[in-house]
Amino acid sequence: FSVCNMLAMPSTDGLFHRAIAQSGAAHHTFDPEEGSGIAAEFLGRLGNPSTDELLAMDVGALLEAQEQVAADRSHLPGRNQEPFYPVWGHEALPRAPRELIAEGAGADIAMLTGTNEDELALWGVTGTTAAEVDDMVGAITEDPSGMLATYRRRLDVADPGWLACAIGTDRVFRIPAVRLADARHANGADTWMYRFSWDSRAFDGQFGAAHALEIPFAFNTIDRPGVDVF
């Protein structure tokens, strides 16, 4: 997401010649109204401190408030995106990055983008219960039973954890990445896509091809200490 945001920023024009947006796209941002609302929720959790008071606060208190805001928003239909992402509507990012990219921002920069097969497995969703899957899907669509039926047919998988992983991976990573590539292609931008599907051996196979697993392969660091665990 950071790569796409930077490519959309007018001030970065000419600074990059190639880009890799791994497991990323241009949709994880908030408009000014949403950003102000999230900031108000966060500050409210802290007792609405002044700027000086906020700067002097214990980091633990800030992290706790952050987790509380994220938890509160996770139960709101259509608003369960992680709340702490960039806000557009200012000099650095005047409009939504996906709109700027659709209009040609960064089209002169060659890009490789894509996703992993099981992105959301990194967050432990493969252990999700059937009831939790129902709650998750109910928070993102008005037809949860229809969505679950579609994914069961498409994947031929009944396990609720892997269903949750597939749905979340498509929603958060894969579909936005495809839309990013389509937008760039419409502007004649050199764009390549990948789909990483190498399954990790970690956690008794519950990791699959999780988020970030492709990094050692992309940067040829698979021989680094600790990488062999996965």
Pin down the residues of each PLM region.
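Histidine- and/or cysteine-centered catalytic micro-motif in compact active-site loops
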Residues: 116-117, 154, 196-199
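Short glycine-enriched nucleophile-adjacent loop
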Residues: 2-12
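Flexible loop/turn segments at secondary-structure boundaries
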Residues: 1-2, 26-29, 119-122, 200-203, ...
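Substrate-access "cap/lid" subdomains that shape
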Residues: 13, 18, 22-136, 162-186
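Active-site-proximal cap/lid insertion segments
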Residues: 133-156
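Extracytoplasmic/periplasmic substrate-recognition and gating elements
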Residues: 149-161, 220-230
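Mobile gating loops/cap/lid regions near enzyme active sites that modulate substrate access
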Residues: 174-230
